[in-house]
A protein has these predicted regions:
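Acidic/polar low-complexity segments and flexible, solvent-exposed patches
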Residues: 1-148
Protein backbone atom coordinates (compact mmCIF):
# COMPACT_ATOMS: atom_id res chain seq x y z
CA UNK A 1 0.00 0.00 0.00
CA UNK A 2 2.80 2.41 0.93
CA UNK A 3 4.59 1.56 -2.35
CA UNK A 4 1.50 2.42 -4.38
CA UNK A 5 1.13 5.79 -2.65
CA UNK A 6 4.86 6.50 -3.09
CA UNK A 7 4.77 5.65 -6.83
CA UNK A 8 1.57 7.64 -7.28
CA UNK A 9 3.21 10.71 -5.74
CA UNK A 10 6.32 10.25 -7.94
CA UNK A 11 4.17 9.92 -11.08
CA UNK A 12 2.11 12.96 -10.09
CA UNK A 13 5.22 15.11 -9.48
CA UNK A 14 6.78 13.91 -12.76
CA UNK A 15 3.58 14.78 -14.63
CA UNK A 16 3.49 18.26 -13.11
CA UNK A 17 7.14 18.92 -14.02
CA UNK A 18 6.78 17.63 -17.59
CA UNK A 19 3.51 19.50 -18.07
CA UNK A 20 5.01 22.74 -16.76
CA UNK A 21 8.02 22.43 -19.10
CA UNK A 22 5.79 21.81 -22.12
CA UNK A 23 3.52 24.72 -21.14
CA UNK A 24 6.48 27.12 -20.77
CA UNK A 25 7.99 26.08 -24.10
CA UNK A 26 4.69 26.64 -25.91
CA UNK A 27 3.95 30.02 -24.32
CA UNK A 28 7.49 31.24 -24.97
CA UNK A 29 7.11 30.47 -28.67
CA UNK A 30 3.67 32.01 -28.87
CA UNK A 31 4.39 35.23 -26.99
CA UNK A 32 7.62 36.56 -28.43
CA UNK A 33 8.98 40.05 -27.87
CA UNK A 34 8.32 41.08 -31.46
CA UNK A 35 5.83 43.81 -32.23
CA UNK A 36 3.62 43.94 -35.31
CA UNK A 37 4.04 46.92 -37.62
CA UNK A 38 2.05 47.91 -40.68
CA UNK A 39 4.34 48.89 -43.54
CA UNK A 40 2.79 51.01 -46.27
CA UNK A 41 4.32 49.39 -49.34
CA UNK A 42 4.39 51.09 -52.72
CA UNK A 43 5.84 48.12 -54.56
CA UNK A 44 8.43 45.38 -54.97
CA UNK A 45 10.97 45.58 -57.76
CA UNK A 46 13.35 42.95 -59.06
CA UNK A 47 15.50 45.55 -60.82
CA UNK A 48 17.22 48.37 -58.97
CA UNK A 49 17.22 50.62 -62.05
CA UNK A 50 13.47 50.20 -62.61
CA UNK A 51 12.83 50.83 -58.91
CA UNK A 52 14.96 53.99 -58.99
CA UNK A 53 13.14 55.23 -62.10
CA UNK A 54 9.69 54.62 -60.56
CA UNK A 55 10.45 56.26 -57.21
CA UNK A 56 12.70 59.13 -58.30
CA UNK A 57 9.98 61.70 -57.60
CA UNK A 58 9.18 60.32 -54.13
CA UNK A 59 11.03 62.11 -51.37
CA UNK A 60 9.25 60.10 -48.67
CA UNK A 61 10.40 56.48 -48.90
CA UNK A 62 12.54 53.68 -47.50
CA UNK A 63 13.95 50.94 -49.69
CA UNK A 64 14.80 47.53 -48.25
CA UNK A 65 16.76 45.06 -50.36
CA UNK A 66 15.92 41.46 -49.50
CA UNK A 67 16.95 38.52 -51.70
CA UNK A 68 17.69 40.80 -54.69
CA UNK A 69 14.25 42.40 -54.48
CA UNK A 70 13.68 46.04 -53.64
CA UNK A 71 10.76 46.80 -51.32
CA UNK A 72 9.64 50.44 -51.30
CA UNK A 73 7.86 51.65 -48.16
CA UNK A 74 6.14 55.01 -47.77
CA UNK A 75 5.07 54.68 -44.13
CA UNK A 76 5.25 52.58 -40.97
CA UNK A 77 2.74 52.41 -38.12
CA UNK A 78 1.58 50.10 -35.34
CA UNK A 79 -2.07 51.14 -35.69
CA UNK A 80 -4.16 49.39 -38.35
CA UNK A 81 -6.50 52.39 -38.66
CA UNK A 82 -3.57 54.72 -39.31
CA UNK A 83 -2.29 52.24 -41.91
CA UNK A 84 -5.65 52.44 -43.68
CA UNK A 85 -5.58 56.24 -43.45
CA UNK A 86 -2.06 56.34 -44.95
CA UNK A 87 -3.15 53.97 -47.71
CA UNK A 88 -6.05 56.30 -48.57
CA UNK A 89 -3.74 59.33 -48.62
CA UNK A 90 -1.23 57.70 -50.95
CA UNK A 91 -3.90 56.22 -53.20
CA UNK A 92 -5.42 59.69 -53.56
CA UNK A 93 -1.96 60.81 -54.74
CA UNK A 94 -2.03 58.11 -57.42
CA UNK A 95 0.02 55.33 -55.82
CA UNK A 96 -1.00 51.69 -55.65
CA UNK A 97 -0.49 50.77 -52.01
CA UNK A 98 -0.31 47.51 -50.06
CA UNK A 99 -0.37 47.19 -46.29
CA UNK A 100 2.21 44.64 -45.20
CA UNK A 101 2.49 43.30 -41.65
CA UNK A 102 6.04 42.79 -40.38
CA UNK A 103 7.43 41.89 -36.95
CA UNK A 104 10.29 43.84 -35.42
CA UNK A 105 11.82 43.72 -31.97
CA UNK A 106 13.40 47.03 -31.03
CA UNK A 107 12.15 48.81 -27.93
CA UNK A 108 13.39 52.26 -28.98
CA UNK A 109 11.74 52.05 -32.39
CA UNK A 110 8.56 50.66 -30.81
CA UNK A 111 8.36 53.61 -28.40
CA UNK A 112 9.01 56.12 -31.17
CA UNK A 113 6.39 54.68 -33.51
CA UNK A 114 3.84 54.56 -30.68
CA UNK A 115 4.43 58.28 -29.99
CA UNK A 116 4.26 59.17 -33.68
CA UNK A 117 1.00 57.22 -33.99
CA UNK A 118 -0.46 59.41 -31.23
CA UNK A 119 0.60 62.51 -33.17
CA UNK A 120 -0.95 61.18 -36.38
CA UNK A 121 -4.22 60.46 -34.57
CA UNK A 122 -4.26 64.07 -33.38
CA UNK A 123 -3.39 65.46 -36.83
CA UNK A 124 -6.03 66.69 -39.22
CA UNK A 125 -4.08 67.67 -42.32
CA UNK A 126 -2.47 65.37 -44.86
CA UNK A 127 0.66 67.53 -44.82
CA UNK A 128 1.10 67.02 -41.06
CA UNK A 129 0.58 63.27 -41.37
CA UNK A 130 3.13 62.95 -44.19
CA UNK A 131 5.64 65.05 -42.25
CA UNK A 132 5.27 62.74 -39.24
CA UNK A 133 5.70 59.68 -41.49
CA UNK A 134 8.87 61.22 -42.90
CA UNK A 135 10.27 61.23 -39.35
CA UNK A 136 9.09 57.64 -38.76
CA UNK A 137 10.89 56.48 -41.90
CA UNK A 138 14.04 58.35 -40.86
CA UNK A 139 13.79 56.59 -37.48
CA UNK A 140 13.50 53.23 -39.25
CA UNK A 141 16.61 54.03 -41.30
CA UNK A 142 18.55 55.12 -38.24
CA UNK A 143 17.47 52.55 -35.66
CA UNK A 144 16.55 49.39 -37.58
CA UNK A 145 18.51 49.43 -40.83
CA UNK A 146 21.80 50.46 -39.21
CA UNK A 147 21.58 47.44 -36.90
CA UNK A 148 20.99 44.90 -39.67
Amino acid sequence: MKKKIFYSIIILITGIIVGRNIYLSKTTQTFSNKDIYYFIQEGVYSSKSIMEENVKNMDLKVVDEIDNKYYVYLGITKDENIAKKLKEIYESLGYQIYIKELSLSNEEFNNNVTQFDLLINASTSTKEILTIEKVVLANYEEIIKKNI
